[in-house]
C-alpha cells in the first residue's frame, strides 16, 4: 500500500473541525497541479468547496509510515466555510490525469443545534483498521496480500498507528456495490458459506479488513441517508473530537447516537459519555462491538495507541496489576474496573458473530421478540416470538450481548462484567465469537486471542472457558443509568434494517 500507482495521496492535519477552522493538506504525487473537492455526504451529495491549482510534489514514503506517519510537508490549506453543513465531508484530491484518492473530515456545527441529536462518527475505528503503509491493529495487510500466512501476518499487527498518513482506499472509499459482512444466503448441506457478493469480491479483491470500518457505503452512511430522507436532521462530531483539550463535546445535547461499529474508545470519550448519561442524557446505540477496546491518543492526538489484548505485554503505561487510566486493553479488563457494559448495557464478549462465515451460519438473521410491549417497539405490530428483520437480514457481522437466564419464559440478564441488573431484554438471537473448532471449511474470521477473551469474560482460559465464547447471544435491550437512558440495538447491522 504505497503511492507507487501514480495517484496523488494525501492526509489532512485534523479529521474533526468546525466552521472557521483551518485545515492543512499534506500530499505527495507524481507532480503537477491537483484540485481538491470537499463534498458533504448524506442522503444527497453537496459540494462544499473546490480548490484548483494545488501543486503537489513527489515525496518519499518513509519506513513504518503506518506507525510513524509520512512527514510530508503541507501542500495547501483551506478554511472550513461558515456555510458548510455539519456532517461527513469526503475530501477527494484529483490530479490532471483524473487519478484521485480520498480522505475525510467530520464537520461539527458552529454551535449545537437546538433539538437535534448528535451522531458521533466512529473515526477511532476507521484509524485502527487503516492499513496504508502496511499494517493496522489487526495484521500487516500488505504482507497478507502478498501471501504471508494469516497467523504470521496477524503477528505483525502494530499497537501504535499514525493518523498522519493517507487511508487505504478499499476501506475508506470502496467501489460501488461493496457487500455487507453477512452470509446473505443460507448454505445448503455440505456447502461452503458465501460471505457477501462473490462476483464483486472477485472483481475488486478487497482486503479482509475493508468492510469493517469507514463511512462511505457502510452503516453510518446508510443511517444518515435514511434519517435525512425521512426528515431527521442531525448534528455531527467524531471520536477524535473528544481529544480536544478541555472540550465539552456533549454539552447542550439531549441525545447521542452511535451507529455501526464504534469499537475503539479513549478514556476521554468514555468519561464524557458516562457523565452525559448520568446527567440525564439519552444514549442510543444502533451498532455492535461498541466500546470494546480501550485506546489512547499520543503526540498531540496524532498517534492512536491500540495494543488490544497485548496491552499487558506491550503497553509502557501498564504496571503490574495496576495500569493507569490511560493503559490499553479490553475495556472489560478487570484491572480497569470499568467494563463497557456499565454504559452500553451489553458487551461483544457475550455476543459475537451471527450469519457470518461459520458463526451461526444458518441463523435467522433476526431477533426473536420477547417483550413486544417495550416502548422501543410501540406501533411495530410485533408480538411475542415474532422475528424482527429476518428478510433483511437484520443480524450479521458483530453483535453485543449478555449472559442470559430465563424466568417464566422471559430472558433476564445473567451475571456478566458490568451487565446492569435492570436490563430490559427486548429480543435475542444466537451468536458466537469463534468459528466452530471442528469447522471443515477453513478459517474465514481472523480470531483474536481466545484464551485472553475467555479469561476475562468467564474467569478461565481453559477449553471450557473458550467453549463458552461460542454460546453467546445478540441482544436488543435498554436500561436506565443515573438520570439517563440507554437503548442498545446490539448489532452493527441495524442501519440495514431501516426502510
Task: Give the residues covered by each predicted segment.
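Proline/serine/threonine-rich low-complexity linkers at boundaries of modular beta-sandwich domains
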Residues: 1-7
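Ligand-binding face of N-terminal immunoglobulin V-set domains in extracellular IgSF glycoproteins
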Residues: 9-32, 37-44, 49-104
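Aromatic-Pro/Gly-enriched surface loop or interdomain linker
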Residues: 29-45, 49-55, 99-249
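Helical hinge/lid and interdomain linker segments adjacent to catalytic or ligand-binding clefts
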Residues: 56-70, 75-79, 83-85, 209-299, ...
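Structural motif
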Residues: 90, 118, 254-259, 486-488
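Active-site-proximal beta-strand/loop segments in catalytic clefts of secreted hydrolases
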Residues: 94, 120-124, 239-240, 258-261, ...
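Short secondary-structure boundary/capping segments
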Residues: 133-137, 272-274, 293, 297-309
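Glycine-rich, aromatic-lined ligand/substrate-binding cores of catalytic
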Residues: 301-499
